[in-house]
Structures are given as structure tokens and as C-alpha cells.
């Protein structure tokens, strides 16, 4: 519910923070996000005028603790309606009421590295940059400077390789949508596993599937 305040509803079932729910709102039925859960006496719930949640719509929690807390902070810091903040982080398909169940997601892709695509030696500059970057174990913004064709992408691919071997996830951003096919082709040649491409030209269902599979840990390279 994209408004500035929160509303109280009751439920007889266990609900966790960050879950989508369907609730009555005036004469309408809307999608809401559980922001806080409080336990009160069952007798009070039955006799109170608090409206009841119609249904819990998720098989999982949409917003886990780190993201949940970040969105609460963003709403307060930027003085923006808390409902709009949470809504903006949901795929469009989850912002609407639907009778369809959440699509099933296959098991995690098994990523294998194709050595045939990297049968060449790195330059001394590439080796130095890669060695330094591999030592970084936490968030650290780093700029790799080089002219076009100097081999920056290969450094990125070697780093992706390292993270995939460590069972971690990788998010790769490209400056414009026209570069997606080129990067996707490079990644598919290097890794035998599903690569998720998420952009505005996909249908809502396609974007949702990639979002959900990434969210559940089944997609390691996006």
C-alpha cells in the first residue's frame, strides 16, 4: 500500500516481516507488505475492530533482513512514503493481486568453467590488476582504467570465475542495453550454467522469473 503511514491488521496465522499480504482497504482489496509483527491476546483480536488479513501471498519472504532494514532507513532518510519505497523494489507482477501461484523455480544451475575460452596468457598489467583485486574480500569500489581493447573485460571474467568457484553470486552491470548481448555471449562461452540477463526489454514474467531465481539463490550470475 504506497502511502506514508502503516496500518494495523490482524491474523490468526504466523506472519513474518517482509511478506506480501492481501488486505481489505476501504472498499478495495490491495497488496501490502508486513512491516511489523506484534503478539496480542487472541480474545482481544476476536473482539477488536481491526480488519483481518485476507491472505498471505508469498511462499517466502520478499524482503530479507538486510534489504528490509535498508528500505526502512531509506524511507525515513529521504522522507518518502514507506509503501512506495517497498513497492519500488518489487517486480511489477508482484505488485498486483493474482490467483496464480508463484512459478516453480528449477534447482540451482551447476556452473562449470570452460577452459577453452581462456587459453591465453594475461599481460603483466592484467596479472597485476587481477592479483590486487583477488586480495579484496569485502566491498571496495575499484576503477580499472584502460583504453578500449586493453583487456579489462577479461579481468572481470577472471574475477567472476573466482567468485563462482567460491559459490558466491555475481551482478554485472553494463552501461547500456545494447551491450547486453555482447556481454552475455562472453559469459556463456566461459561458463556452462544459466546466465540471467535482466533489462527493460523483457516481459514482466521474464523479469520476475530472473528476479525470483536470483532471490532464491538459484541464479549465480546476473
Q: What does each model-identified segment do?
A:
Residues 1-222:
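Accessory, non-ATPase domains that flank or precede helicase/AAA+ motor cores in DNA-metabolism machines
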Amino acid at each position: 500500500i504506497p502511502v506514508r503511514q502503516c496500518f494495523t491488521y490482524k491474523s490468526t496465522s504466523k506472519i513474518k516481516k517482509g511478506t506480501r499480504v492481501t488486505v481489505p482497504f476501504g472498499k478495495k482489496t490491495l497488496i501490502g507488505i508486513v512491516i511489523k509483527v506484534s503478539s496480542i491476546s487472541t480474545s482481544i483480536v476476536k473482539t477488536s475492530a481491526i480488519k483481518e488479513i485476507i491472505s498471505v501471498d508469498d511462499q517466502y519472504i520478499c524482503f530479507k533482513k538486510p534489504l528490509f532494514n535498508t528500505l526502512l532507513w531509506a524511507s525515513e532518510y529521504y522522507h518518502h512514503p514507506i509503501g512506495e519505497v517497498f513497492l519500488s523494489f518489487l517486480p511489477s507482477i508482484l505488485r498486483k493481486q493474482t490467483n496464480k501461484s508463484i512459478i516453480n523455480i528449477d534447482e540451482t544451475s551447476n556452473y562449470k568453467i570452460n577452459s577453452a575460452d581462456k587459453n591465453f596468457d594475461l599481460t603483466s598489467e592484467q596479472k597485476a590488476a587481477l592479483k590486487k583485486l583477488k586480495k579484496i574480500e569485502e566491498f571496495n569500489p575499484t576503477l580499472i582504467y584502460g583504453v578500449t581493447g586493453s583487456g579489462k573485460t577479461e579481468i572481470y571474467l577472471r574475477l567472476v570465475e573466482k567468485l563462482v568457484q567460491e559459490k558466491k553470486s555475481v551482478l554485472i552491470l553494463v552501461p547500456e542495453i545494447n551491450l547486453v548481448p555482447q556481454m552475455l555471449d562472453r559469459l556463456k562461452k566461459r561458463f556452462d550454467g544459466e546466465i540471467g540477463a535482466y533489462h527493460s526489454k523483457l516481459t514482466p514474467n521474464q523479469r520476475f522469473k530472473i528476479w525470483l531465481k536470483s532471490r532464491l539463490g538459484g541464479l549465480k550470475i546476473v
